């Protein structure tokens, strides 16, 4: 009996010591948790006020409409197309197209500065994207806005080419490119690819809209509003060209398809389409002058 009691006594004395150590360690964990958690909360809240990560930016329009607006880019296409109609209206009102050049340059400078600010200030980038996000692609959150390339292409055309060539290049960018993107996304998988991210279906759409655009502009608007054109502003006319209206329109469709389909140094097509279409259309008209 004495031996058993002697053996039992150490066990009985060790158990309270073990429990005491466990209680002390649990208390130390609780104390450290109480100390560290508020510190993390304070740090994270102060960081959030100063820096908003670009990866946390979400476009409101994409959240509201989900994959539909992301896939079909409805507001962006409406914006692109509307520029063509607005320009056509200004043409009928006799606005001097050369007077548009400086407003385009000012717009480019302002938007470029805004992009520099937003790409270096995440909080401003978040506000900017939530304001005009419906007109942006997701990749443009992290890089320069496509509108910059759009304006730069128009500056090139308005500065170096005649009135009709400049307007045609803008119409092809507004309407042929929109048609190519819409049809290409819908039916492009059914046709062969003609270039990187370019399908035969999209090229056919660009060609068709290009033909219609040239025929309507040169066949109706130029003669109907001839009084708004100064001498030398319109390069093509039936009297000065070996091309008929129908042939010119067909070649205009080819220009639209080529300009939309060519991938030039992986540059943004908002820049390459007006530049290439201006160069091609100008070459076509001058080549067939009488």
Swiss-Prot record:
Optimum pH is 7.0-7.5. GO terms for cellular component: endoplasmic reticulum; endoplasmic reticulum membrane; nuclear membrane. Its cofactor is Ca(2+); Mg(2+). Residues 23-33 have a biased composition (Polar residues). CTP-dependent diacylglycerol kinase that catalyzes the phosphorylation of diacylglycerol (DAG) to phosphatidate (PA). Controls phosphatidate levels at the nuclear envelope. Counteracts the activity of PA phosphatase PAH1/SMP2, controlling the levels of PA and DAG for the synthesis of triacylglycerol and membrane phospholipids. May be involved in vesicle trafficking between the endoplasmic reticulum and the Golgi apparatus. This is CTP-dependent diacylglycerol kinase 1. Maximum activity at 30 degrees Celsius. Labile above 40 degrees Celsius. Residues 1-77, 125-140, 185-203, 266-290 are lumenal. The gene is DGK1. It comes from Saccharomyces cerevisiae (strain ATCC 204508 / S288c). Residues 96-103, 162-163, 225-244 are cytoplasmic. The modification Phosphoserine is found at residues 44-46. CKII-mediated phosphorylation of Ser-45 and Ser-46 regulates its function in the production of PA. InterPro entries: Dgk1-like. The chain crosses the membrane at residues 78-95, 104-124, 141-161, 164-184, 204-224, 245-265. Present with 784 molecules/cell in log phase SD medium. It is found in: Endoplasmic reticulum membrane; Nucleus membrane. Inhibited by N-ethylmaleimide, dCTP, and sphingoid bases including sphinganine, sphingosine and phytosphingosine. DAG pyrophosphate, cardiolipin, CDP-DAG, and lyso-PA inhibited activity by 23-66%. Also inhibited by Ca(2+) concentrations of more than 1 mM, by addition of EDTA or EGTA at 5 mM, and by 5 mM Mn(2+) and Zn(2+). Stimulated by major membrane phospholipids including phosphatidylcholine, phosphatidylethanolamine, phosphatidylinositol, phosphatidylserine, phosphatidylglycerol, and phosphatidate.
């Amino acid at each position: 009996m004495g031996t058993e009691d002697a053996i039992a006594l150490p066990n009985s004395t060790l158990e309270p010591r073990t429990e005491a150590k466990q209680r002390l360690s649990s208390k130390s964990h609780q104390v450290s948790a109480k100390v560290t958690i508020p510190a993390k909360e304070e740090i994270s809240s102060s960081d959030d006020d100063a820096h908003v990560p670009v990866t946390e930016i979400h476009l409101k329009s994409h959240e509201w409409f989900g994959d539909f607006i992301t896939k079909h880019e409805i507001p962006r296409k409406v914006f692109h197309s509307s520029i063509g109609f607005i320009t056509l209206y200004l043409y009928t009102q006799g606005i001097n197209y050369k007077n548009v050049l400086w407003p385009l340059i000012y717009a480019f400078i302002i938007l470029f500065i805004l992009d520099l600010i937003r790409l270096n200030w995440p909080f401003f980038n978040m506000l900017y994207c939530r304001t005009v996000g419906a007109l942006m692609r997701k990749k443009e959150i992290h890089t320069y806005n496509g509108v910059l390339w759009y304006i730069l292409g128009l500056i090139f055309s308005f500065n170096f080419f005649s009135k009709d060539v400049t307007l045609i290049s803008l119409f092809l960018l507004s309407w042929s490119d929109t048609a190519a993107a819409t049809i290409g996304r819908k039916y492009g998988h059914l046709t062969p690819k003609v270039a990187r991210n370019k399908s035969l279906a999209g090229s056919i759409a660009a060609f068709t809209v290009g033909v219609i655009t040239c025929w309507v502009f040169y066949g109706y608007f130029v003669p109907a509003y001839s009084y708004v054109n100064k001498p030398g502003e319109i390069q093509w006319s039936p009297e000065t060209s070996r091309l008929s209206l129908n042939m010119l329109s067909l070649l205009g469709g080819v220009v639209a398809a080529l300009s939309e389909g060519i991938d030039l140094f992986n540059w943004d097509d908002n820049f390459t389409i007006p530049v290439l279409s201006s160069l091609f259309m100008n070459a076509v008209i001058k080549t067939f002058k009488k």
